Amino acid sequence: SRPFVVRMITDSLRWWCEAIGIDGFRFDLASALARRRGEIDGVSALIVAIVSDPVLRERKLIAEPWDVQGYALGAFPYPWREWNDQYRDVVRKFWLHGYTLKSGDMATRVSGSHDIFFYRGPNSSINFLTAHDGFTLADLTMYSEKHNEANAEGNRDGTNNNHSWNLGVEGPTDNQNILEQRLRLHKSLMASLVMSAGVPMLLMGDELGRTQAGSNNAYSLNPELNWDATENFGGGWALSWDKRENDLSDSIAALSSIRAKYLSEIIDEFFTGSIDQGTKRKDIAWFHRDGLEMGANSWQDNSLRYLAFMLDATHKQSLFVILNGDK
């Protein structure tokens, strides 16, 4: 918060923008920047200086809104965007069995997390399922437990709260039925991400089926390991273009096209369920598997793993999305 430190940081950021052409920044452990007198309030001297700067405020500003001392999701001012770990955890729990979850929680995250970003809009939420920390998408359905033995810390490092599901076999398998289920879950997770209101973030390599062999703390691996070493996931740090999962990659491309065609112009604001006087349709409507619209009591159901919603995408077309976590 000291003026000369704030000036040094903002001058450095502005130099990267003006001299190099950087169009945005992601701030690691950003809640440390928002802390004032020991409390996180989003109006620290540095945060105010960044959002007040005519150059920096026009760049993409993305916060990881937590650090070792605190959690600050939703505390950053416009135009900051924030990594939404609540989105990550809820969507994982919906698709990967064995976790308690109210159906309303999934609907809230898919429709933009209005409970967190009500005053700023859904585009303030960076929706993600995987990141550089934690499991890859492939490992979410291959491992129920972390495997960080190669880090030489007795597998104590890395979180134990992965919300993952191995479908009965820990690690790789030749069982074709399990392989098909895993691929279907990968597609379902990606469909939820791409079809949600908010800004979707994909971990590079997930679209290719990249694995870390169950490691959820790759940062601590020895960087001098041979690329082909077993401890280095058989080259998992690099993208295996020759072993890529074309089916998954093609599916993500198709989903992205659907988002661009139907959703790009209607997800800047939260869906409310209100009726458009021009189309006489709700901007979003939620349905049970029997086709009946969901009522208020439905949102407290802990066992419901099926959600369907219709978006009033255009005056001529609507988009109907089914999320079936039961099968």
Predicted regions and their residues:
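Residues immediately flanking
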Residues: 29, 65, 323-325
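Short, acidic/polar
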Residues: 2-18, 185-190
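Carbohydrate-binding surface patches
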Residues: 286-327
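Catalytic cores of secreted or luminal carbohydrate-active enzymes
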Residues: 244-292
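Acyl/amide activation-and-transfer machinery of modular secondary-metabolite enzymes
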Residues: 219-239
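Active-site groove signature of glycoside hydrolases
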Residues: 10-36
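A short, structured beta-strand-centered segment in the mid-to-C-terminal lobe
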Residues: 3-6, 14, 236, 240-259
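Conserved alpha/beta catalytic core and glycan-binding cleft of carbohydrate-active enzymes
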Residues: 21, 36, 42-204, 208, ...
